[in-house]
Swiss-Prot record:
Biochemical pathway: One-carbon metabolism; tetrahydrofolate interconversion; Amino-acid biosynthesis; glycine biosynthesis; glycine from L-serine: step 1/1
Keyword terms of this UniProt record: Amino-acid biosynthesis, Cytoplasm, One-carbon metabolism, Pyridoxal phosphate, Transferase
Site-annotated residues for Plays an important role in substrate specificity: 229
Catalytic reactions on record: (6R)-5,10-methylene-5,6,7,8-tetrahydrofolate + glycine + H2O = (6S)-5,6,7,8-tetrahydrofolate + L-serine
Record's subcellular location: Cytoplasm
Principal subcellular localization: cytoplasm
Coiled coil: none
Source species: Nitrosospira multiformis (strain ATCC 25196 / NCIMB 11849 / C 71)
Record function comment: Catalyzes the reversible interconversion of serine and glycine with tetrahydrofolate (THF) serving as the one-carbon carrier. This reaction serves as the major source of one-carbon groups required for the biosynthesis of purines, thymidylate, methionine, and other important biomolecules. Also exhibits THF-independent aldolase activity toward beta-hydroxyamino acids, producing glycine and aldehydes, via a retro-aldol mechanism.
A molecular-function term among this protein's GO annotations: glycine hydroxymethyltransferase activity
Cofactor: pyridoxal 5'-phosphate
Protein name: Serine hydroxymethyltransferase
Oligomer and partners: Homodimer.
Taxonomic lineage of the native organism: Bacteria, Pseudomonadati, Pseudomonadota, Betaproteobacteria, Nitrosomonadales
Gene name linked to the record: glyA
Top-level enzyme category: transferase
Length: 416
């Protein structure tokens, strides 16, 4: 018999110490990685529930195992909530990650050797949009589009030119490091002109879309995927939305082609996050996310730093560090010493290697969850600029760390 007294602390003290260390790090460091956020206690409670014990291969009402009456309710709640949030015809909440959701779309729309057109990783795209090191770039003939050199905005003319030249069967829109609004309808027209499918990966923008602060690609694209963490603030996982005609093929692409049993405890946590995302509080939160990002970008520009594309319309932006003669790697390391976490990130036409880079990516979702507003975001941006102006000055790093920890103490992630 399992005893409820056998807690993690007593069963595995080594692991417990690592988790406690991570808890302390999250409380004492300012998190600016654009793809990270803090899940609510309710989301984490669902993910840590007895649902982790249940196998449920198949879909609601059509399982290969018995005893699925309650997990059917859980999964259907998640499906219905996504459908309502994004006005989707078809929804699959089983993908274990955004990458697996994307793979399912490729399996549905393409055959090995078919051509896809996606945003270049070097210009802000994602690995799964046809990068040569990823499965999407190995199995399929991947062609890449990028940004205009003069404005650093998406080059829709190039997308159209490449589409007509290469005749891809699938066009991929979406990005992991692009700060401006993407014109889904313009992509739709380009796809229609050559008879291609349009696939939108809105992983970074989904929370903003749910709140009405970023255009909704659902109903415009043939396929839409997203992660469920990032701006959606749920557990780590993926979802797929599509036109109803693709239901059978997409369901099969997830199970049995790429996955076995769904993670029912994660699907439950997703369902909680989707309910939270339908609230007015969440809408207000997403508005503040954008306000905070814009304030930080403006202050950094005033401090002499260059923002890629010149501005942000969403939760994130890239900082070009070349004028400061430091690399993204150096900047991220110095900021971490100062209790501020960012990720090094390539900028368009970056001369540095991918593990070094000439930029950093800054995102506002996590700090906004903590309660930061414009005042704190302005203060934080000045702290970042202080570090970037003197990345090797220990006295500066120590002082910034002191102020960062004070901000964290004022705005704890998990109170009580």
């Amino acid at each position: 018999m399992l005893s409820s007294y056998n807690t993690l602390e007593t069963v595995d003290p080594d692991l417990w110490q690592a988790i406690k260390g991570e808890m302390q790090r999250q409380e004492e460091y300012i998190e600016l990685i654009a793809s990270e956020n803090y899940a609510s206690p309710a989301v984490m409670q669902a993910q840590g529930s007895v649902l982790t014990n249940k196998y449920a291969e198949g879909y609601p009402g059509k399982r290969y195992y018995g005893g699925c009456e309650y997990v059917d309710v859980v999964e259907q709640l998640a499906i219905d909530r996504v459908r309502a949030l994004f006005d989707a015809e078809y929804v699959n909440v089983q993908p274990h990650s955004g990458s697996q959701a994307n793979a399912a779309v490729y399996l549905t729309a393409l055959k090995p050797g078919d051509t896809l057109l996606g945003m270049s990783l070097a210009h802000g795209g994602h690995l799964t949009h046809g990068a040569s090191v990823n499965l999407s770039g190995k199995i399929f003939n991947a062609v890449s589009y990028g940004l205009r050199s003069d404005t650093e905005e998406l080059d829709y003319d190039e997308v159209a030119r490449l589409a007509h030249e290469h005749k891809p069967k699938l066009i991929v829109a979406g990005a992991s490091a692009y700060s401006l609004v993407i014109d889904w309808k313009r992509f739709r027209k380009i796809a229609d002109d050559i008879g291609a499918y349009l696939f939108v990966d809105m992983a970074h923008y989904a929370g903003l879309v749910a709140a009405g602060y970023y255009p909704n690609p659902v109903g415009i694209a043939d396929f839409v995927t997203s992660t469920t963490h990032k701006t959606l603030r749920g557990p780590r996982g993926g979802i797929i939305m599509a036109r109803a005609e693709h239901e059978k093929a997409l369901n099969s692409a997830i199970f049995p082609q790429t996955q076995g049993g769904p993670l029912m405890h994660v699907i439950a946590a997703k369902a909680v996050a989707f309910k939270e995302a339908a609230s007015q509080e969440f809408k207000d939160y997403q508005e503040q996310v954008i306000d905070n990002a814009r304030v930080m970008a403006k202050v950094l520009q005033e401090r002499g730093l260059r923002i890629v594309s010149g501005r942000t319309d969403c939760h994130m932006f890239l900082v070009d560090l070349r004028p400061k003669y430091i690399t993204g790697k150096q900047a991220a390391e110095s900021l971490e010493v100062a209790h501020i976490t960012v990720n090094k990130n390539a900028i368009p036409n970056d001369p540095q290697k991918p593990f070094v880079t000439s930029g950093i990516r800054i995102g506002s979702p996590a700090i906004t969850t903590r309660g930061f507003a414009e005042f704190e975001s302005e203060q934080l941006a000045h702290l970042i600029a202080d570090v970037l102006e003197a990345p090797t000055d220990s006295s500066v790093l120590t002082e910034v760390a002191r102020q960062a920890k004070a901000l964290c103490a004022k705005f704890p992630v998990y109170q009580g």
